[in-house]
Regions:
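Conserved short submotifs of the Hanks-type protein kinase catalytic core
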Residues: 93-107
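ATP-binding glycine-rich loop module of kinase domains
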Residues: 33-66
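Short beta-strand micro-motifs within the conserved protein kinase catalytic domain, predominantly
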Residues: 84-96
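Juxta-kinase regulatory segment immediately upstream of eukaryotic protein kinase catalytic domains
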Residues: 1-23
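Catalytic-loop of the protein kinase fold
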Residues: 143-160
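Conserved C-terminal C-lobe helix
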Residues: 265-278
Length: 295
């Protein structure tokens, strides 16, 4: 096996002022034109992200990296994001990099593994699940109140902390109220959690046209993520051999699997909230603020 790619040296040197001299640098991911590393030091840890200069999507990922940094700044000023989350950003000889504080948590899919078992129906698990959903919606409510949609709500962008709280990451695709300025066109995110109205808009417009995601689309994606990670099945069934546009055409119909037919055990409050989130008409979905009291 080859040696793991190293992060931008100038970024590591600069971040040492935040973490202290690195004691560990570990590659977390290397896919879709970008890489991420965990940099641990005596004073803390950060996630350093950089575009992959030799990747097919290097140019787009460079723009996305700059866009995410811009989004983090705006969301922080709007009070929708903890000011400690963003650490630093800059350029390097291969493009751009961005560093955010490390969040100690595991992706939603792994965290909810105990709930996917019939044995998950126990008194201690219900408030834990409700707490994850509530803290997730509280974060989205702050974004939505500021006029933003995260636009990439999905299991891998939601971490569950040891205390049972949801933490939202990855703001590169977010859609804000000032998106009249030049930006990377939003064309949906993870197919399986794409809201029907986003799927419809993507199918109806050229590939270089920006589709402005609204908060209601986040709510559908929230419901889809909880449905998927609790039941083990995606809410919209389709053949995995279909290409992305064909899958989006199925999603655009607005039909989902009945949750009661696939849930591992009965949890009426959670079921009702997820079902409401997956309403095909955006106007029929609850807001994030309304959801915070439903879990």
């Amino acid at each position: 096996m080859g040696q793991a790619p190293a992060p931008p040296g100038d970024a590591v040197a600069l971040l040492a002022g935040h973490t202290g001299e690195p004691t560990e640098i570990r590659l977390l991911s290397d896919r879709r034109g970008s890489r991420a590393w965990k940099i641990q030091g005596p004073n803390g840890a950060v996630v350093l992200k950089a575009n992959r200069p030799d990747g097919d999507e290097a140019r787009d990922k460079t723009a996305e990296m700059a866009q995410e940094d811009d989004h983090l700044r705006h969301l922080t000023v709007a009070g929708a994001l903890d000011p400690d989350y963003r650490v630093s950003a800059g350029t390097w000889d291969g493009g751009r990099w961005l560093a955010v504080n490390w969040i100690d948590g595991e992706p939603l899919w792994q965290a909810l593994a105990p709930a996917r078992s019939p044995e998950g129906d126990r008194a201690s698990l219900r408030p834990w699940l409700a707490g994850i959903a509530r803290t997730w919606t509280e974060h989205l409510a702050r974004m939505h109140a500021a006029g933003w949609a995260h636009a990439d709500v999905q299991p891998t962008n939601t971490l569950v902390t040891p205390g049972g709280h949801a933490a939202v990451i990855d703001y590169a695709l977010a859609c804000g109220p000032d998106d009249g300025h030049r930006r990377v066109p939003y064309r949906g995110a993870l197919t399986h959690t794409t809201a029907p109205e986003i799927a419809t808009a993507v199918l109806a417009t050229p590939a270089d046209t920006h589709v402005q995601a609204q908060p209601a689309a986040d709510i559908w994606s929230l419901g889809a993520s909880l449905f998927w990670c609790w039941t083990g099945q995606r809410p919209v069934p389709y053949d995995d051999d279909l290409d992305r546009l064909e899958k989006l055409a199925v999603i655009a119909k607005g039909t989902t699997t009945m949750l009661r037919d696939v849930r591992p055990w009965s949890f009426p409050e959670l079921e009702d909230a997820i079902t409401a989130c997956l309403a095909p008409d955006p106007a029929d979905r609850p807001t994030a603020k309304e959801l915070t009291s439903a879990w």
